[in-house]
Amino acid sequence: MNISNSSRREFLKASALAGVGATLAGCSTPNEAHVKGAVTLPTGIVIQPDIGRTRPRHAGQKPVHDLTTTPQEKIRVAVIGLNRGLTHVESCAGLDFAEVVAVCDIREDRSKRAADAYEKKRGKRPAIYQGTEHIWEQLVAREDIDVVYIATPWEWHVPMALRTMERGKHAFVEVSAAVTVDDCWKLVDTSERTQKHCLILENCCYGENELFVLNLAREGVFGELNHAECAYLHDLRDVLFSLGSEGDWRREYHKQYDGNLYPTHGLGPVAQYLGLGRGDQFKYLVSVSSPEVGLTKYRNAKQPNKGKHAAEKYFCGDMNTSIVKSELGRTIMIQHDVVNPRPYSRINALCGTGATFFDYPARLAVDEPKMFGLKSSGPHEWLDDADMKMMREKFSHPLWRKLEEKAAGGGHGGMDFILSYRHLDCLRRGVSLDSNVYDAAAWSSIIEISSRSVATGSTPVNIPDFTRGLWKTMRPLGIAS
């Protein structure tokens, strides 16, 4: 067939439009009412349309971005939840300025194990609270506790943190600090009203590579920062079906939400690189999820626990990818996948006009290698081992250099020990912590924010400004020495 140029253009245009129409006809596009109204998930959970709204500060509340307390010679600690919390007990046992005065778990074997471990290291046995679901309330009522570590299943994080602060103690809460945006606001409001710290125990901010990249960013190696990538990619299929452990409760969230269920391990460090909450702020998020396949397939193939989970229906897509836009226009990609076979990765990437870093394995490219005395030919290649070693020697974080030897053998490559050392030392000296309740709320809010975006056809959803405007004047996180 002979088609003139003008006819060809019309033909291609018509074909393209027809293709678009066919594609759209096959898509599930949410209507306007669905996008703007409340969303009800299959389990009955309702996500309101105004979750991205910044709420006003109530009378009697004061900001806590620079909260300091009276210096103390010794910080008195209690730990609730002694599966994950055992690591915190052991970390505190290695700090001469910290004392674990009480431990708590519903399971007696875990309480005994934690008390034994501390007594063996320090020669003094902490009080034990165990056996019943609400025994922790007696612990937080004690008058001889400064800080309560909360390392329980997620549903207990917020009620325990609120009660802890109401009782005049600082709450150190495991990740994520909360699941819903409403609960994030409860943490913020209670911290401001009681003037007590509510810290998210994001240990990944204190890994060797994370501290290295933070120092590179603060020293200007990256130039002007513009993009970051992070994730929690971890094959947890066997863990999710393990009895007597986190599998007892963690799998439940795969039945309830379709979004990023565990954002903070990746997001916390890159938020600190970018100064989010301190000179920049989360603005909105767009999220997409793949189909749910992996967990169901694993369950059907393995029939864990003699097939007792056969009737369970999982809702969360295998891979969730969310993109966050900041107030300064920078972007962050956040991913979550715990149900497919893959090596572990948090991606941990940072990009700027002067350099790019990607982790797993650690790689760095710099725009002007000669500026740092490197052999590299330029930005089109990753630094070789010799150049990377040179950069680490120049820019290793002072906190890591100071504590590397003491942290060796600690949980998660030493980051658990440094996490406790840093924040308890800040309390001891009476200075502000590296992280505050606004970080805990913003990082944790991604769970419900991403779920609403997915449920409304990947529409943008605003992220609340939990600082209520303070981010505009707060200084970036400094380098801890």
Where in this protein do the model-derived segments appear?
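N-terminal glycine-/serine-/threonine-rich beta1-alpha1-beta2 phosphate-ribose binding loop
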Residues: 2-5, 12-169, 185, 189-197
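C-terminal helical cap and adjacent loop that interface with cofactors, partners, or active-site loops
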Residues: 14-19, 33-59, 87-88, 319, ...
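Predominantly a Rossmann-like dinucleotide-binding segment in NAD(P)-dependent oxidoreductases
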Residues: 83-84, 193-199, 204-314, 334, ...
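Aromatic/hydrophobic pocket-lining residues that form π-stacking "cages" and hydrophobic walls in ligand
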Residues: 160, 187, 213, 449-450
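ADP-ribose/adenylate-binding Rossmann-like module
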Residues: 168-180
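A short catalytic or substrate-binding loop motif that flags glycine-/basic-rich loops and adjacent residues
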Residues: 264, 313-318, 326-327, 341-342
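Active-site beta-strand termini and strand-to-loop segments that position acidic
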Residues: 322-328, 352
